Amino acid sequence: NPRTSSRPLPSGRASKNFVLLLLFFSISIYLLSCWLICDFVFILSPIPLLLFIVYPYTKRFTAFCHFFLGLALSIGPIAGGVAATCDLTGLYLTLPIGIFTFFWISGFDILYALQDYQHDIRNGIFSVPSIYGINNAIKISSVCFIISLIAICYYSFIYTFNFLSILIILIILMNYIFQIIHSLRNNYSFFKYNSYIGILILILVISDILFI
């Protein structure tokens, strides 16, 4: 892919051996950290690893590969809750954020794949844009954004309803609208702005603690 050819591994700036060594140490530290937290967390620790290993290969057989990425990242807030309690008692708090993350990342990744539309078609790579077309991809992404917004509104109104939470939701909504409107242009700008959403969600969760 010409778009990703300058990245460290494709460009040769990072050797395969170095990347494999880095991967080995990263996984080792991750598993050790899970083991130190508690047995329950350690037992569940292979699940995120499996999802991140499988995700890149999903582009070879399903257009819904974006949702595998969304699933892999949506485990983050849920796993954080499990790590904090070593059980599933906090699931009612973390599940709405997990659902938000799933649809937010899936919707964004669909729009992000628009820039590889021609390349994916030529090389037989599966994605929502390459299989269902650009217009349908934007529609599916919009539905994902709407569902994610409903999920975070639910979390906000139930647990953190205050002026700050309303402001954050409005900013996220405007960000979504911006992404959809500019989805056929340079993806870098809304990739940058999209990265700020995670920070906004962190502020939203912190406000839950401050305003209780």
Regions of interest found by a model, annotated:
Residues 7-92, 96, 175-189, 196:
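Intramembrane alpha-helical segments
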Residues 1-45, 122-163:
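Multi-pass membrane catalytic core of lipid/isoprenoid biosynthesis enzymes
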Residues 2, 108, 112-113, 201-202:
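Alpha-helical transmembrane segments and their lipid-water interface positions
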Residues 147-212:
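Extended hydrophobic alpha-helices typical of membrane-associated regions
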Residues 40-52, 66-121, 134-147, 153, ...:
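Functional transmembrane core segments of multi-pass inner-membrane proteins
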Residues 20, 24-27, 45, 49, ...:
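Residues within membrane-spanning alpha-helices of integral membrane proteins
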